[in-house]
């Protein structure tokens, strides 16, 4: 999610719909709109990436990632380019997805973001040096 990787000439809806089109999924536009609703962007569905803020682009990328209802979402620095408030909104979306059964594997260098996780694994020089279950989760 670091760079969003959205198609610049496609609307938010079209960007989210793309994986469904590759899979030839029926009702792809409806499913894509539901994913945008999930991340709070249904009203911005016709906007292109250059018309969206960084946080909105990030949410479009998340909607695209979850539109196929994956069991696991891999997120590399999903809040790295965002202000604290928007980063917390993104983490709230991930927390909600996780509470519904989606496994979220998230890479971050920010302890505040890591505090949202039930479990954190810290690495140094390619090795795990800390693996802990968090008793208090930020939400």
PLM ranges: what are they?
Residues 134-139:
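ABC ATPase nucleotide-binding domains
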């Amino acid at each position: 999610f670091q760079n969003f990787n959205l198609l610049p000439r496609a609307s938010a809806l079209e960007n989210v719909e793309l994986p469904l089109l590759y899979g030839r999924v029926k009702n792809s536009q409806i499913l894509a709109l539901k994913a945008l609703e999930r991340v709070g962007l249904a009203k911005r569905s016709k906007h292109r990436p250059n018309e969206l803020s960084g946080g909105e682009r990030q949410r479009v990328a998340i909607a695209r990632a979850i539109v196929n209802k994956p069991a696991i979402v891999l997120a590399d620095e999903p809040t790295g380019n965002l202000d604290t408030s928007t980063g917390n909104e993104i983490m709230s979306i991930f927390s909600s997805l996780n509470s519904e059964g989606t496994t979220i594997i998230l890479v971050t260098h920010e302890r505040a973001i890591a505090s949202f996780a039930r479990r954190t694994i810290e690495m140094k020089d390619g090795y795990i040096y800390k693996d802990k279950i968090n008793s208090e989760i930020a939400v």
